[in-house]
């Protein structure tokens, strides 16, 4: 029953001797209706929306400038996510403005499309988060790295931005140029996306190489039937 119908029924019962009981009952039902089902629907829709809109963007709107507080909000996600043995060994270096040129010189994007020389001129990312580790890299550190990187990019999506994980970069030169105390493991580029990306369902064994056609970037994804082990 919709909210209007509940209100109309309450008004109708006001002259009835059972008004108090009916009023309390309907109010309780209304509270339940507003609380649990609606919250669950919003949560499910929100997660799916974020996952669908979170893509690996290589081109960004040059007219939009990422702010320091936006990078901080993204980095704050690290205080909320799990960490192996709760060691919390990852550290984060925000990069903006002129320093972005330093990072750009040491990263490589679009490895599967070398002929395009991505990103296109004028769409280069102008903000980054360099993720470092206070300890030697290990499988547990890499697990933490994956969790926090994905979570940060989802946060970026939620605030209207986008990004990409960059593993192809010159570690030692970047460490020296940014004067990093710890070894960099991953670079996140952040910005307002200027690309159209679509997912394409495919079967196991088919090509998984992303490609571009008429300005759209297509990303093959194996359908769920092939992902479930039986």
Regions found by a protein language model. Give the residues of each.
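Acidic, surface-exposed loops and disordered segments
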Residues: 6-230
């Amino acid at each position: 029953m919709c909210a209007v119908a509940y209100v109309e029924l309450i008004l109708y019962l006001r002259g009835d001797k059972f008004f108090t009981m009916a009023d309390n009952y309907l109010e309780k039902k209304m509270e339940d209706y507003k609380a649990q089902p609606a919250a669950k629907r919003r949560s499910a829709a929100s997660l799916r929306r974020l996952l669908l809109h979170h893509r690996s963007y290589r081109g960004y709107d040059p007219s939009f400038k990422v702010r320091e507080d936006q990078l901080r909000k993204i980095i704050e996600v690290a205080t909320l996510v799990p960490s192996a043995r709760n060691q919390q060994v990852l550290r984060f270096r925000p990069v903006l403005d002129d320093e972005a040129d330093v990072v750009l010189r040491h990263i490589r994007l679009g490895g599967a499309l070398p002929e395009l020389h991505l990103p296109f001129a004028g769409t280069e990312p102008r903000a980054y988060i360099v993720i470092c580790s206070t300890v030697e890299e290990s499988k547990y550190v890499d697990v933490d790295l994956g969790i926090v990187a994905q979570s940060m990019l989802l946060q970026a999506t939620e605030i209207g931005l986008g990004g990409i994980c960059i593993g192809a970069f010159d570690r030692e030169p970047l460490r020296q140029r940014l004067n990093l105390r710890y070894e960099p493991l991953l670079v996140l580029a952040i910005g307002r996306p200027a690309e159209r990306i679509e997912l394409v369902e495919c079967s196991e064994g088919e090509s998984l190489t992303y490609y571009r056609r008429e300005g759209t970037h297509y990303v093959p994804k194996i359908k769920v039937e092939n992902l479930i082990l039986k």
